[in-house]
């Protein structure tokens, strides 16, 4: 079980720009969800692609693709 961690979930309102899976991936609006208390908050984000991993099959723009789940850098981690 993951405790006291903040994760960034790609929201349907997010702007997703992926340059051949390299460099920086940008989100215009992102949703942070605390795994411990399930509180959520929105903010813009800019996260290096190397922190990404594919979690589940979904469709964001009408094309089958994977939802991106981004682990937040410990230096910017937030606690409840």
UniProtKB/Swiss-Prot annotation:
Q: Where in the cell is it found?
A: Membrane
Q: Which residues cross the membrane?
A: 13-33
What are the protein's UniProt keywords?
Answer: Membrane, Transmembrane, Transmembrane helix
UniProt KW Transmembrane keyword: yes
Entry membrane topology = Single-pass membrane protein
Its Gene Ontology cellular component terms are: membrane
- Stated family: Belongs to the UPF0377 family.
Q: What is this protein called?
A: Putative UPF0377 protein YMR324C
Q: Which species is this record about?
A: Saccharomyces cerevisiae (strain ATCC 204508 / S288c) (Baker's yeast)
């Amino acid at each position: 079980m993951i405790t006291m961690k903040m994760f960034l979930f790609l929201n349907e309102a997010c702007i997703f720009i992926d340059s051949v899976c390299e460099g920086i991936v940008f989100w215009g609006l992102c949703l942070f969800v605390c795994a411990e208390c399930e509180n959520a908050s929105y903010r813009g984000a800019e996260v290096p692609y190397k922190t990404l991993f594919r979690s589940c099959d979904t469709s964001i723009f009408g094309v089958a693709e994977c939802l991106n789940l981004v682990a937040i850098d410990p230096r910017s981690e937030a606690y409840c």
